[in-house]
């Protein structure tokens, strides 16, 4: 079942997710080959442009002001600083430059500066993405005017489990922002995190929510939790690699046209596990040594692995 614009049911997705592993991989990889070059990856870079002191209480996040973590508060970077980082990202092979700020929602006074960042990064020939928290319709329109290509706003987990992870906002708040972004004509980047203490049923409901959006996200980041000392989820049980691959494969089947990004947690993955993820349908990664505040595989390690697998940069 890979029909586009299909409204999926929980039982549909359970049947896909829980089928024998080899059958799941075969189905996912067949669909992946139909819609994408199986030997190419999209390279993106993620920069924290405003770090720490976020008023939200996401139980996994190093940047929450509710917890004492290794992260130090840093003010919003200047346009010049951001553009220098964007130039370095382009030189390192990135095609998309993502800018993240630890806000509940961006202050209106910051919008002109954010628009300058977007315009400057686009002038370098890079695609632009931002993740700034919740957006109003007006703010989304301003970012679109500046030329923003993608906006990231993850739903994190299933609607049923969401309030076990975050209490300072509602799941519906996430959907409202996604609707504002979509209405403004900006492409949607939306995914979640595995390893928050959720069940397999939660992961299936999470995928159902994404796949049944009126227009599924153009980009779907799948993160494996990086436990952060000082946060409530610091001791969360690690999701097994096979479960990660099942989630990616199912996402590929449900959302055949979307880019599936293997995001946080790659530093803890073996080459073999990453290879399975790419075979299952992941076709986008963040390159560079940092993902906001956490470590990412060093460039030379990525280059070595991608060469072994015959994976090249997406045109």
Curated annotation (Swiss-Prot):
Residues 39-266 form the Radical SAM core domain. [2Fe-2S] cluster binds at residues 98, 129, 189, 261. It holds the Pfam family BATS. GO terms for biological process: biotin biosynthetic process. Gene3D superfamilies: Aldolase class I (3.20.20.70). Keywords: 2Fe-2S, 4Fe-4S, Biotin biosynthesis, Iron, Iron-sulfur, Metal-binding, S-adenosyl-L-methionine, Transferase. Pathway: Cofactor biosynthesis; biotin biosynthesis; biotin from 7,8-diaminononanoate: step 2/2. Catalyzes the conversion of dethiobiotin (DTB) to biotin by the insertion of a sulfur atom into dethiobiotin via a radical-based mechanism. Belongs to the radical SAM superfamily. Biotin synthase family. This is Biotin synthase. It comes from Legionella pneumophila (strain Corby). The gene is bioB.
């Amino acid at each position: 079942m890979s029909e586009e614009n299909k409204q999926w049911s929980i039982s549909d997705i359970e049947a896909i997710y829980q089928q024998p592993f080899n059958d799941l991989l075969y189905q996912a990889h067949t669909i992946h080959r139909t819609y994408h070059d199986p030997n190419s990856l999209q390279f993106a870079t993620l920069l924290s442009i405003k770090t720490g002191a976020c008023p939200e209480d996401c139980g996994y996040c190093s940047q929450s002001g509710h917890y004492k973590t290794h992260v130090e508060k840093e003010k919003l970077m200047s346009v010049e600083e951001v553009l220098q980082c964007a130039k370095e990202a382009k030189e390192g092979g990135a095609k998309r430059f993502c800018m993240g700020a630890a806000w509940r929602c961006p202050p209106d006074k910051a919008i002109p500066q954010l628009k300058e960042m977007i315009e400057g990064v686009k002038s370098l020939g890079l695609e632009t993405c931002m993740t700034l928290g919740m957006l109003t319709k007006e703010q989304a329109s301003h970012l679109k005017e500046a030329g923003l290509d993608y906006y990231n706003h993850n739903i994190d987990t299933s609607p049923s489990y969401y309030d076990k992870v975050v209490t300072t906002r509602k799941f519906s708040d996430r959907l409202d922002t996604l609707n504002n972004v979509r209405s403004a004509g900006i492409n949607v980047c939306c995914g979640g995190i595995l390893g928050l203490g959720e069940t397999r049923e939660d992961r299936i409901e999470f995928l159902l929510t994404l796949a049944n959006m009126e227009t599924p996200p153009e980009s779907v980041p799948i993160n494996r939790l990086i436990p952060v000392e000082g946060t409530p989820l610091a001791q969360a049980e690690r999701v097994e690699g096979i479960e990660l691959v099942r989630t990616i494969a199912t996402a590929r089947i449900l959302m055949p046209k979307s880019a599936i990004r293997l995001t946080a947690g790659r530093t803890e993955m073996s080459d073999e596990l990453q290879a399975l993820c790419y075979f299952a349908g992941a076709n986008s990664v963040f390159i560079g040594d940092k993902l906001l505040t956490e470590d990412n595989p060093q460039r030379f390690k990525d280059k070595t692995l991608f060469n072994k697998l015959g994976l090249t940069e997406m045109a």
